[in-house]
Structures are given as structure tokens and as C-alpha cells.
Amino acid sequence: MQAALEVTARYCGRELEQYGQCVAAKPESWQRDCHYLKMSIAQCTSSHPIIRQIRQACAQPFEAFEECLRQNEAAVGNCAEHMRRFLQCAEQVQPPRSPATVEAQPLPAS
């Protein structure tokens, strides 16, 4: 969970910040009053191109991390290495290049 939260904070930080402020401001009713902000985080994480790439490229280390957490519920610190591997993988994923940023290559002379 912590690894996923770190990735979410990196790429959907604005949404996460707004949700956190709402929860802090409405301690009695945050579940109801801040639900739409929670949904905006979900929308960001499901649609952000880099997060989609991370989910694909780093599925194996993330699954290993989740499995470690299940096996070590009472001692999640035992999973620090698994989390480090996932975050290391996530950091290596490059954002997709949009067609506008790809430089045109000259055609070879014939």
C-alpha cells in the first residue's frame, strides 16, 4: 500500500492533497463529503499514462510486495526490500513520448 501511495503522490499529488485537506477539514463527515475527491484520485491513477505503464512494467515486483505484506501482516517491515524493488522499477519507467515530442528524422538520401 505504501509503495502504491508513493507512486500516486508523485503523479496525482494535486488530487491527493485536495482529498487530504477535505478529510482534515471534515473529521465527522469526510467519508460522505470527500467521496468525490477520492474518486478524482481513482480517476487520475487509472488514466495517467505513466501509472498505467508502471502497472504493466512493474506488475511482478508489485505482486511480490503485496504477497509479502499478506504473509507478514504483523511485521510489514520485513517487506522493505520488496517495496524498494517496486519503487526502483517504477522510477525506471519512462513517460510515453507523445507524437509532438518525437523529432522528425530526415529521410535517407537516395
Swiss-Prot record:
The keyword Acetylation applies. GO terms for biological process: cellular respiration. This is Coiled-coil-helix-coiled-coil-helix domain-containing protein 5. Keywords: Acetylation, Disulfide bond, Mitochondrion. The gene is CHCHD5. Residues 9-52, 55-97 form the CHCH domain. Monomer. The modification N-acetylmethionine is found at M1. A motif (Cx9C motif 2) lies at residues 34-44. The keyword DNA repair does not apply. A motif (Cx9C motif 3) lies at residues 58-68. It comes from the Eukaryota. A motif (Cx9C motif 1) lies at residues 12-22. GO terms for cellular component: mitochondrial intermembrane space; mitochondrion. It is found in: Mitochondrion intermembrane space. Disulfide bonds join C12-C44, C22-C34, C58-C89, C68-C79. A motif (Cx9C motif 4) lies at residues 79-89.
